[in-house]
Amino acid sequence: MVSYHICEYQDSDYKSVVDVFTKGAEEYIPSTFRHLLLLPRTLLLLLGVSLALVLVSGSWLLAVVCIFFLLPFLWFLAGQPWKNYVSKCLHTDMADITKSYLSDRGSGFWVAESGEQVVGTVGALPVKEPPSGRKQLQLFHLAVSSQHRGQGIAKALVRTVLQFARDQGYTDVVLETSTMQIGAVTLYLGMGFQKTGQYFPSMLWRLVGIRFVQLNYSFPSA
């Protein structure tokens, strides 16, 4: 097994961090496309368009050709939520990681390195308006490069955030992830996180039928 270590982010890591984060998000486009194709409303759309064309033109061939033309549009639709998410992050908190995550003692950003290469990332920021009596830290951007999965890196990064939160006196660590990221949800639940809710963050996510799951880890002493 390849060795790795976790350390605090440095500005020299930026390009590698963006690469790991972007690839980690966009790798869900194919599975989102398959998920979208199997949604009842998508199947009804494809069937409805096909039948309408057959009734109007009398040609099944035209109907089949039309479906093949619709598939690229559905692929585009499946990719838009992920691309928009990446773009939003790169223009907000990840535009300047040092400023966003390392300018305050209550936040942090870490990378996992293997052979002097960044292979994993995770960040954490305090929740601005936590529930009364709670001090919450939100976990962001957990990602591990595809070549280095199955080595416990993601779990180690989450543990780094949990230990940081405990040391800083937080009562909870919260996060959001999508229902499409099954491996991530399984990881969090296995580490003691609890589901607290789910929702569609935008109309685009609703169109592709993917919800965001909200999870919470409360420290026993809290």
Curated annotation (Swiss-Prot):
Membrane-traversing stretches = 43-67
The UniProt entry's coiled-coil ranges are: none
Q: What is its main location?
A: endoplasmic reticulum
- Give the membrane topology: Single-pass type II membrane protein
Q: Do you know which Gene3D superfamilies this protein is assigned to?
A: 3.40.630.30
Give the enzyme's EC designation.
Answer: 2.3.1.-
Q: Using the record's annotations, give every residue carrying the modification N6-acetyllysine.
A: 99
* Catalysed reaction equations from the record: L-lysyl-[protein] + acetyl-CoA = N(6)-acetyl-L-lysyl-[protein] + CoA + H(+)
Any GO molecular function: N-acetyltransferase activity
Please give the GO cellular component terms listed in this UniProt entry: endoplasmic reticulum membrane; endoplasmic reticulum-Golgi intermediate compartment; endoplasmic reticulum-Golgi intermediate compartment membrane; membrane
Keywords annotated in UniProt: Acetylation, Acyltransferase, Endoplasmic reticulum, Membrane, Signal-anchor, Transferase, Transmembrane, Transmembrane helix
Keyword Transferase included in the entry's annotation: yes
**Lumenal topological intervals:** 68-222
Fetch the CDD domains from UniProt: NAT_SF
SUPFAM superfamilies per record: Acyl-CoA N-acyltransferases (Nat) (SSF55729)
Q: Where in the cell is it found?
A: Endoplasmic reticulum-Golgi intermediate compartment membrane; Endoplasmic reticulum membrane
Q: Name one GO biological process term.
A: amyloid-beta metabolic process
Record keyword Ribonucleoprotein present? no
Family under the similarity heading:
Belongs to the NAT8 family.
Question: What is its biological role?
Answer: Endoplasmic reticulum (ER)-membrane-bound lysine N-acetyltransferase catalyzing the N6-acetylation of lysine residues in the lumen of the ER in various proteins, including PROM1 and BACE1, using acetyl-CoA as acetyl donor. Thereby, may regulate apoptosis through the acetylation and the regulation of the expression of PROM1. Acetylates and stabilizes BACE1 immature protein, leading to increased steady-state levels in neurons. By acting on BACE1 expression, may regulate amyloid beta-peptide formation. N(6)-lysine acetylation in ER maintains protein homeostasis and regulates reticulophagy.
Protein name per UniProt = N-acetyltransferase 8B
